[in-house]
């Protein structure tokens, strides 16, 4: 009701999008400097940093196995050596599910779903309990490769862990972490100033260079662990579609996984 908090800072775009009645319309003037795909097109959600689905590879274990994208994960040499969390319970694993579907043909494409089947057949039933278990498991040498997300993987690279980041050649989705102004916020002026602040050049450069959050601003600074967007095959998630069909996508994955486990 806006009596306490003024802004919801952080959280998924899809959750905010499906609860439009809770938010105050506002588009910052700084939105003009945002990468086109992540601009505030709906009028009430401000994306401020991006997190991409990536593969994390243990450089001590990979040997001469080529991993450039999703297709390479079907290599029989990787069976049982692929780390992933459960798309039914992990937001990063679900993001990878929708990313691979989009990259391999589409959310409703039979060949894309066949890829999901083949991948989880190669995962061989080894599901990590959490998202952190994926990148930690790869860094610790329990797995050769993991389906993870950019932020913690970039930090591991900066920390000197024996890992590298692979942006899938078939296409990498970046999802925005978002902020909204709560409808009826008591101090509306300051709420709008905060939205302007997180989209400012100063803050965007700090996030990209000092932290491991990828900025949404065009030409913002990033650290050495993060490949420039221009060098990545970026594909755009249909966020409204995924939001509307999430339960169906999860159910279809669960059916595939359960069937594989029964064999």
Predicted region positions:
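Mature extracytoplasmic/periplasmic domains
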Residues: 172-173, 177-237
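Alpha-helical segments flanking ligand/cofactor-binding loops in enzyme cores
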Residues: 71, 135-136, 154, 192, ...
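A ligand-binding cleft/hinge motif common to bilobed small-molecule-binding domains
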Residues: 12-18, 139, 144-162
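Short hydrophobic/aromatic-enriched beta-strand-loop microsegments
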Residues: 25-28, 163-167, 216
């Amino acid at each position: 009701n806006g009596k306490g908090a003024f802004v919801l800072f952080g959280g998924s775009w899809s959750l905010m999008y499906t609860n439009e009645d809770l938010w105050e319309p506002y588009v910052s003037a700084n939105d003009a400097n945002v990468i086109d795909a992540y601009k505030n097109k709906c009028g009430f959600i401000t994306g401020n940093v991006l997190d991409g689905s990536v593969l994390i590879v243990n450089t001590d274990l990979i040997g001469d196995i080529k991993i450039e994208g999703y297709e390479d994960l079907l290599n029989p040499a990787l069976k049982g050596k692929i780390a992933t969390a459960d798309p039914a319970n992990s937001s990063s694993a679900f993001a990878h599910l929708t990313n691979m579907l989009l990259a391999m043909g589409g959310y409703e494409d039979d060949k894309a779903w066949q890829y999901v089947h083949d991948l989880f057949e190669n995962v061989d039933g080894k599901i990590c309990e959490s998202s952190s278990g994926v990148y930690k498991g790869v860094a610790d040498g329990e797995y050769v490769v993991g389906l993870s997300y950019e932020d913690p993987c970039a930090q591991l690279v900066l920390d000197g862990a024996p890992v590298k980041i692979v942006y899938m050649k078939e296409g990498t989705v970046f999802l925005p972490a978002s902020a909204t102004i709560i409808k009826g916020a008591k101090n509306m002026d300051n709420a709008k100033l905060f939205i302007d602040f997180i989209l400012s050049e100063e803050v965007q450069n700090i996030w990209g260079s000092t932290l491991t959050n990828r900025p949404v601003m065009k030409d913002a600074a990033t650290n050495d662990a993060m490949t420039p967007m221009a060098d990545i095959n970026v594909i755009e998630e249909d966020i409204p579609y995924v939001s509307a069909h999430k339960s169906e996508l999860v159910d279809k994955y669960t059916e595939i996984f359960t069937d594989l486990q029964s064999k």
